[in-house]
Every structure is written in C-alpha cells, then in structure tokens.
UniProtKB/Swiss-Prot annotation:
Keywords: Disulfide bond, Glycoprotein, Hemagglutinin, Host cell membrane, Host membrane, Hydrolase, Membrane, Signal, Transmembrane, Transmembrane helix, Viral envelope protein, Virion. The chain crosses the membrane at residues 393-413. Its EC number is 3.1.1.53. GO terms for cellular component: host cell plasma membrane; membrane; viral envelope; virion membrane. It comes from Bovine coronavirus (strain Mebus) (BCoV). Residues 267-379 are annotated as: Esterase domain 2. Structural protein that makes short spikes at the surface of the virus. Contains receptor binding and receptor-destroying activities. Mediates de-O-acetylation of N-acetyl-4-O-acetylneuraminic acid, which is probably the receptor determinant recognized by the virus on the surface of erythrocytes and susceptible cells. This receptor-destroying activity is important for virus release as it probably helps preventing self-aggregation and ensures the efficient spread of the progeny virus from cell to cell. Pfam families: Hema_esterase (PF03996), Hema_HEFG (PF02710). Residues 7-127 are annotated as: Esterase domain 1. Residues 128-266 are annotated as: Receptor binding. This is Hemagglutinin-esterase.
Amino acid sequence: MFLLLRFVLVSCIIGSLGFDNPPTNVVSHLNGDWFLFGDSRSDCNHVVNTNPRNYSYMDLNPALCDSGKISSKAGNSIFRSFHFTDFYNYTGEGQQIIFYEGVNFTPYHAFKCTTSGSNDIWMQNKGLFYTQVYKNMAVYRSLTFVNVPYVYNGSAQSTALCKSGSLVLNNPAYIAREANFGDYYYKVEADFYLSGCDEYIVPLCIFNGKFLSNTKYYDDSQYYFNKDTGVIYGLNSTETITTGFDFNCHYLVLPSGNYLAISNELLLTVPTKAICLNKRKDFTPVQVVDSRWNNARQSDNMTAVACQPPYCYFRNSTTNYVGVYDINHGDAGFTSILSGLLYDSPCFSQQGVFRYDNVSSVWPLYSYGRCPTAADINTPDVPICVYDPLPLILLGILLGVAVIIIVVLLLYFMVDNGTRLHDA
C-alpha cells in the first residue's frame, strides 16, 4: 500500500513540474526491425547520382541512407509500379512498416484509359489498392513484386489499350481480339499461375459502362477461377453510361495456385504482376506519411482514405508542402515527421508517437507497444493524476477483505482469551 501511494505521489509531483509526454507527430519504431517504402523524398541513390551531396532534396535524414531499411525510387510509387510499364521493384521486410510514397500518381498526372475516361475512377482505384497494401502489411513482414506467368492459346497478343501521357498500363494485360472474331461478343480464357509467396495482391478490372466499338456497345465481364479450390472471383459491368467511365479495379488477395482468367464479353484481361506477401507476423499497424505536392499542383487524399485504424496510423503536416531544394522537395514539416526514424519509441497511437511509457497528457487511442497507463491532467493550480481505476478498485477490495479478516481474528482471540480467564 505504501509503495502504491508513493508511486501516485511521485507521478503527481512529475505532473506538477509539467511533464506531459504528449503524442508527437512523427513516424518511428519500437526497435531496429523496421522498413520504409518511398520515392524521391527518401531516395538516397537519386541524391548521390543526380544531386551529389545535396541532401536538401530529401525529407529523410541522410544518416539513415546506409541503414539498409529503405526501398525508394524517384518518380515512382508502389501503385505506379504495380499497374504500369514505369516499374521499380519495391522490396523490403520488417516488423514495423512505414510508407511515404504515392504522390507520383495523382490528379496532377490526369491519367485515364481513354480520351472519354475518368481520372476520378483511377483515384478510386488508388485508394482501394493502398487499402489492401496497408491492411496486409500489418500482418506480413515482406513485400516485393513478382511477375505472373500466363498462357493464352490464341494467336492474338497483348495490346496497349490503356495509356495516357507517359503511362502505359501493362497490369492487367489486355489480350487483343482474334482476327476471326467479327465483334467482341465472344468467350476467351487464359491460364495464369501464382507460386512462391504466402499470398498475392492481384488486380481484377473491368470497364464499368457501355463500351462503344464500331457502333456496338459492350458490357465488360471478367472472372478469375481457382482451378485448385473451385473458388471464382468476378466482375460484371453494371453501369449504363456511355462516357465518363473508366477501368474499375478490385484488388484481390489470393493464395498460390493455378488460375483461369475468363472473359465473356469485350477483351480478356490477365494479371502480369502481383504484390508478393511473405512471412506472417503478429499484428503491427503500419505508418503512412501523407504524400502530396506543393499546392501549385493538384494532389489527392487516397492514402489517407486507405489508412485507417486499427491497421494504420496516418501522419501529416498542417501546412503546405514548401521544399528548400524546390517547392516539391525538402519540406521542413515532413522532414520533422520523418525525424522520428532516428530513434526508438515505446508507444504508437492514432494521435501520434509517445516518447515515454509512464504518464501522458493524452490517452492513446488504438495504441500499440508499451503505452502510458496514466493520464496526467493539470488544472491551473492543482495537479490531478487520473489512473485506470480497475487496479485501484481491486486493491481496495483486497484491502477491505484483509481488514475484515484481521477484525474477525482479533475478536476471536479476545473472546477466547476472556473465556479462558473466566474458567481460571
């Protein structure tokens, strides 16, 4: 009892001296088992090869360049590499995963499959993609890309139907119509194989609208059939619009196996790349840093939409991105957020990272790690320490029971002693 009272007293004294331990707006890690995926703002090789010694180009502290815990590529992103010919093989492994990328596919790039397409659909695709990546990297240690081999028995080749500017879609691949087909009302299939990983993220995409070709309108229809388990995954066009639609993608998490891609109308699509997920781990929320341009360019909030508790913590700066190298590279606010990678921290929460695990001015929500078990609330003159009441209630009950037992024993011995004196 004395030790408990002393702990409460010491904590209150600490509170009166102004020790708050507030959550800080950084990304950090419990220990050295972490990994960061990024772009030019954390690409040390780009700085060395293109901008020698000018580390102001990055938001990452250059002390981390030789850590071996970073997979970053200037001008790229995981989503961009997943879908397009502009490819970088992001590869990394860790218990705690941090993402600071995504800005290299935004409304600024204005990508759409056709001239009458919709970039809004591609922003939706981006959000759905990162949702799957973040959720799965909370339970997997390792991420990399793998090629998906497929076999199509026809003579037609894949076609670059979906392209805009410098971006050319190659995942999924479009198989062109066979020369002997007069229209797109036909069924066609291709085999593809997934092997070597625990699970895979693959795209299943359709044009969700009436696709016009030579005065005829078509409804897209695509399926993947797992020949080992009998499970089928499919999408059918449900919209009646004829303009303003685009390539809607769902991102499936599939096991290894032999699959059949099936098209009942329009062109056959088949996956050519997959995110390879390996090495299951205990649930560990990922951390995502907002990836956006200076306000002179249009950005999106899809990584924020995708990053939701409990599987993900989102960190952002409250000000416009204004770099010191140029307006899009070397921002002080985001440099501060990434500075947390220089040290270990015991506790992570929706509000931020806690540097200490004793008391805090803020109760951590969706907490992970060794987190404060007390909230230190300061009134103007009197520090009040509010603790989780359950341990105190249980201790009070135990003390009450002990007092009752002591009183009963005292009464018993007093009565017994009086009886013996009377007998004497």
